[in-house]
Design a protein with these regions (language model features):
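Membrane-embedded alpha-helical bundles of multi-pass transporters/translocases
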Residues: 1-493
Length: 493
């Protein structure tokens, strides 16, 4: 029987489907806090409430992932177990995200609305995210095909994320703001992205063929015990989960809000600058995603991690030295940005290795326990991504309070509201914001810089040490596991 997972169509249609998903994820996860910060006047209590909502919703979301994975695992339909949830999830997510960025509520009314919306997003995004990534192990067990599929999918995900990271700041902040105010601009951007996301995912829904031999097996019951036993019964899952969590916390610090706020405070309230910071910072990751399959054939994963760790050390050192030693200006900006690019290259390489290492535990689980439980295991990737983002929100909010960031953002949000109501012209708004930014103390900007460099480095190094010491599923061991599984299947026929 022909293995449909090697079908070339899958290698294009599956990755293409995630472009819009990652645009919508980038908009909500990376910019919702910035949107709230620069469009709403927040008291300390309200900032605390926003933080509590975001942390609570993301922790809930993370805990919901294995449950959703189990629900998908037992889904049986003529369309398979993954695609129905792709459709339901992406359509409901688009509606929720559009509403999130198109409200004029202020004060505690907005806080209540924000709480409802954020928890709805947590539920709806999980539906299609778990089902999408759960398909990977159903498309191929061949390590080279899986490497190609994973790296290409991350490339397309990166394309969606980079497009959003570049355009959103340019269109919502500074002189290029759509509609003359940040609030109006975010509403329009959300509309476009929420239309594009379902359209892109149609490529996966209608163009991908996955293995469906599970349809002949008994439907497993929904059981928290099963979820717990799957996770705790496989020591490699436990170790890679801890490593992945630490790496993701460090990786998300810059994109979680600290990066944009630092750029605005240190170099001016201009979205184009943060877009440049993102564009250059993420540029090298595109090359890594393209060439990762070739690198994987030449180097073992742990060898690659040595080189990636060194790159990040150099990158973070450049960021710290340039940020502390150089005076303001574009020379400082470009050196800082290049440093971020080098550091991010190492971080993203770690992410790719963590992704593949987690997926490879599916076969190891089958080897140990006789069950693949692919939807449950692959649900751990978004589980720890969301748990990491919850921790990053708490870290970001604490940093803002420590360095008095909201004292400045409240002044900016008042001007943004006045501009959206037509009370002041855009030119006057920008001039007054420039005055506010120029009053920021150097110590406040330096504090933000140290938070977005030292913390990611420390966490990355911790994940590096733990992976090297405790993860045993290297290339040889994985091949041994797959050979044993194939032998068992042959003997069972």
């Amino acid at each position: 029987m022909k293995n449909v997972t090697s079908d070339k169509r899958n290698l294009w249609m599956f990755p293409l489907g995630t472009v819009g998903r990652d645009m919508i994820y980038n908009l909500f996860t990376n910019f919702i806090f910035t949107y709230v910060l620069f469009t709403r006047h927040l008291t300390a209590a309200q900032l605390g409430a926003v933080t509590a909502i975001m942390v609570g919703a993301r922790v809930f979301d993370a805990l919901n992932d294995p449950v959703m994975g189990n629900i998908i695992e037992r889904t049986r339909s003529r369309y398979g177990k993954f695609k129905p949830w792709l459709v339901i999830g992406i359509l409901s997510t688009s509606v929720v995200v559009y509403l999130a960025f198109n409200t004029s509520l202020q004060g505690w009314s907005f806080i209540a609305f924000f709480g409802v919306i954020y928890f709805l997003y947590s539920i709806t995004y999980t539906m299609h995210d778990i089902s999408y990534w759960g398909m990977v192990s159903a498309l191929s067990s061949d390590p080279h095909v899986r490497d190609s599929l994973t790296s290409r999918t991350n490339l397309f995900a990166g394309i969606g994320g980079v497009i959003a990271s570049i355009l959103i700041p340019m269109l919502t902040t500074g002189s290029g703001t759509l509609g003359g105010s940040t609030a109006t601009a975010y509403g329009r951007v959300a509309l476009v992205i929420c239309i594009l996301a379902p359209l892109f995912l149609c490529a996966t829904i209608f163009g991908v063929r996955e293995r469906r031999d599970y349809n002949t097996k008994e439907v497993p019951p929904v059981s928290f015990k099963k979820i717990w036993n799957t996770i705790t019964g496989n020591p490699q899952i436990l170790w890679i989960s801890l490593v992945f969590l630490l790496q993701q916390i460090g990786n998300d610090v810059v994109m979680g809000g600290l990066g944009s706020t630092y750029v605005y405070f240190a170099f001016g309230y201009e979205g184009g600058l943060y877009s440049l910071f993102n564009t250059v910072g993420l540029a090298a990751t595109a090359l890594l995603m393209i060439f990762y399959p070739m690198l994987a054939k030449r180097f073992r994963r742990k060898q690659m991690m040595d080189k990636l760790m060194l790159l990040s050390v150099i990158g973070y050192a450049v960021m710290i030295v340039s940020g502390l030693a150089l005076s303001g200006g574009m020379v400082k900006f470009w050196i800082l940005t290049v440093g971020y690019m080098v550091a991010n290259l190492g971080q993203y390489g770690f992410y790719l290795i963590m992704m593949i290492s987690l997926i490879n535990t599916v076969e190891y689980n089958e080897y140990l326990r006789g069950e693949r439980d692919e939807a449950i295991i692959t649900s751990l990737r978004p589980f720890f991504t969301k748990l990491a983002s919850a921790i990053v929100v708490a870290v970001t909010s604490a940093t803002y309070l420590i360095f008095g960031v909201t004292g400045y953002t409240n002044q900016i949000s008042a001007l943004e509201r006045a501009a959206s109501l037509g009370e002041i012209a855009e030119a006057e708004k920008l001039a007054q914001i420039d005055t506010i930014v120029s009053s920021i103390q150097p110590g406040q900007s330096r504090g933000l810089l140290l938070c977005l460099t030292v913390l990611p480095f420390v966490l990355m190094y911790a994940s590096y040490v733990l992976y090297k010491k405790h993860y045993i599923l290297d290339e040889d061991k994985y091949a041994e596991v797959c050979a044993e599984l194939e032998k068992r299947r042959t003997e069972a026929k």
